[in-house]
Regions:
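Intrinsically disordered, compositionally biased, charge-dense segments
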Residues: 1-15, 123
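Active-site neighborhood of HAD-like aspartate-dependent phosphohydrolases
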Residues: 9-53
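Conserved Lys-Pro-Asp/Glu-containing loop-to-beta segment of HAD-superfamily phosphomonoesterases
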Residues: 15, 110-139
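Short catalytic/ligand-binding loop motif for oxyanion handling, primarily in non-cytosolic enzymes
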Residues: 25-28, 33, 73-75, 82-86, ...
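Substrate-recognition element of Asp-dependent hydrolases with the DxDx(T/V) motif
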Residues: 55-56, 61-93, 99
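Structural recognition of alpha->loop->beta junctions
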Residues: 95-111, 169-170
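Acidic, Mg2+-coordinating phosphoryl-transfer loop and its flanking beta/alpha structural elements
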Residues: 128-166
Length: 170
């Protein structure tokens, strides 16, 4: 006979964690337009300190968000290391404000970490079920999967929605 937790795990979808930059916020076009070249790690000092508040949404961000919001996702987004200067000091606050402004996501649905810590959310802390990460950075997907999670490599909203449906989301 199955336990209650086994039944719950069978019928409850995994928790979705969604990256911000490159999935719903357009970091690349903003920084490229501002700098006149592709962003590199040497460019942090040339960006406005409130850059994360100024990012435009990705063109299809509202399509993706319109689909995943029914599953009560968390935003799992990385902030620059402290050594990156003033932008790092306010990045967590600006990212939180950006999500509230653009998608009405409250701060308690935000998980803001250094990139290397994203993988710590790959498994559910209670029942060890794998969680899902939607991310445009393949390195994050590989680390997530190595930690036991399910990675969805984001290319565009439609491909991500199709991948989630293949996993079993309605």
């Amino acid at each position: 006979m199955k336990s209650f937790s086994q039944h719950l795990t069978e019928f409850d979808n995994p928790q979705i964690y969604c990256d911000m930059d490159g999935v719903v916020a357009d970091f690349i076009s903003y920084t490229t337009n501002l700098l006149g070249h592709k962003f590199t790690d040497n460019d942090w000092d040339d960006l406005p300190v409130d850059m994360f508040l100024q990012l435009p949404p990705m063109k299809d961000a509202h399509v993706l968000w319109g689909y995943i919001k029914q599953f009560q996702p968390f935003m799992l987004t990385a902030v620059p290391r402290e050594s990156r200067g003033p932008i790092a000091k306010r990045a967590w606050k600006d990212k939180t404000r950006w999500m509230l402004k653009n998608f009405k996501l409250p701060s308690n649905r935000m998980k803001i970490v250094l990139r290397k810590h994203k993988k710590n959310f790959a498994m559910d802390g209670r029942d060890k079920r794998p969680n899902i990460l939607i991310d445009d950075h393949m390195g994050n997907i590989k680390e997530w999967e190595s930690a036991g999670g399910i990675g969805v490599h984001h290319i565009n909203a439609n491909s991500t929605i199709n991948d989630l449906k293949k996993i079993g989301f309605p």
